[in-house]
Amino acid sequence: MFAGSVIRKLSHSEEVFARYEVFTSMTIQLRGVLDIDALSEAFDALVQAHPVLASHLETSSDGGWNLVADDLLHPGICVVDANNGAQSGCGGIQSETRLDQSVSLLNLRLTPREGGGELVLYIHHSMADGHHGAVLVDELFSRYTDVVTTGDPGPIIPQATPLSMEAVLQQRGVKKHALSGAERFMSVMYAYDLPATGTPAVLAEPGLPQAVPVTRLWLTKQETSDLAAFGREHRLSINAVVAAAILMTEWRLRETPHVPIPYVYPVDLRYVLAPPVAPTESTNLLGAAGYLAEIGQDTDIVDLATDIVATLRADLANGVVQQSGLHFGTAFEGTPPGLPPLVFCTDATAFPTMRTPPDLAIEDIQGRFYCSISVPLDLYSCGVYEGQLIIEHHGHIEEPAKALEAIRSLLCTVPSEYGWIME
């Protein structure tokens, strides 16, 4: 392969994803008629509209990474025969997609089946956070629908390379403060005799990112609707109620009632900054918010959720969250020594209702992480699609389903325990 031209150097905040070769994927189960040629045309149009998706990463002379343009066209969609594993258009990709950031930052894999199929889009995390990635998938289905219904994928206007978080913050005049926001956890560091916990072994092989185990649950549309209405009644978002439920569940399962729980979650800065930032205008435009949960037998979920929201609002008002990403390092080491185990959860982002042709329907969506990291991961992610709340646990802990079922039980019983009944 001929050497490509350097587009730009990865920023400090993006380098962590290159260091651990982090990809995210969205697996979509489809029911109905699939037109492979139309999907291929839509995917090609997506890449043409976002040329950075056809690039790859190379190490730089200073030990960092460069985003490099390819001289060759992106290989396109990979189609796999569900019966025998035979592939076409995969450029040598094996039956289990091999993710290699030195080759490609984007892969699309389709496995057609009778009556539908499975579509998996993989994207390197240095180029897209969850919001950015969801918008790309939405655009892919929109272009596919246009090809099927009109024969044309729609206008192709090449977009500029997305900016790093650092570049966007500099444009908006956001500067690094002395405090990162993590200082609120200092009071509990080495303050408790923490029980020893087993650490599962995680084998990391550079150049071969591995799938992080994931367990998930869905709330029904009615359960999600009841939860949203309950939140509105108490002026709380689903995010806040879910966060409180996760923390209360973790407190019960840990059996260390006297130990506070540090909680960290990302905040999408696109709509926090002024002027707002378009979803694909930046790669990972995230701040970090923190909360120290002090929970007891009498803790009320509404009070806990309300305090989480109040803390976030205060941290946004003083600008701590907006600049928190400027304190990020490029190494991931899990919970710092002496600190009670962190709880991390993404926000319950509402996925767009994606356009599909009349004879095709999306039945399920599942997210996943791939990386080559030796530190066990333990995090929750949430989302809402088609009116249903999805909660996932990503990581290597034992019995993740136990925690998820306890969270579900709490979320589904809270409205009735408060005497709230939908009219």
From Swiss-Prot:
EC number: 2.3.1.282
Pfam families to which the protein is assigned, alphabetical: PapA_C
Top-level taxon of the source organism: Bacteria
Annotated site residue numbers, Structural role in the organization of the active site: 129
GO BP annotations, alphabetical order: lipid metabolic process
Active site: residue positions: 125 (proton acceptor)
Protein keywords: Acyltransferase, Lipid biosynthesis, Lipid metabolism, Transferase
InterPro entries reported in the protein's UniProt record: CAT-like_dom_sf, PapA_C
Catalytic activities: 2 a mycocerosyl-[mycocerosic acid synthase] + a phthiocerol = a dimycocerosyl phthiocerol + 2 holo-[mycocerosic acid synthase]; 2 a mycocerosyl-[mycocerosic acid synthase] + a phthiodiolone = a dimycocerosyl phthiodiolone + 2 holo-[mycocerosic acid synthase]; 2 a mycocerosyl-[mycocerosic acid synthase] + a phenolphthiocerol = a dimycocerosyl phenolphthiocerol + 2 holo-[mycocerosic acid synthase]
Enzyme class: transferase
GO function terms (MF aspect): acyltransferase activity
Functional description taken from the UniProt entry: Catalyzes diesterification of phthiocerol, phthiodiolone, and phenolphthiocerol with mycocerosic acids, the final step in the phthiocerol, phthiodiolone and phenolphthiocerol dimycocerosate esters (PDIM) synthesis. Can directly transfer the mycocerosate bound to the mycocerosic acid synthase (mas) onto the substrate alcohols.
Comment on protein domains: Consists of two structural domains that are related to each other.
Family under the similarity heading: Belongs to the acyltransferase PapA5 family.
Protein name: Phthiocerol/phthiodiolone dimycocerosyl transferase
Species assigned in the record: Mycobacterium leprae (strain TN)
Organism ancestry: Bacteria, Bacillati, Actinomycetota, Actinomycetes, Mycobacteriales
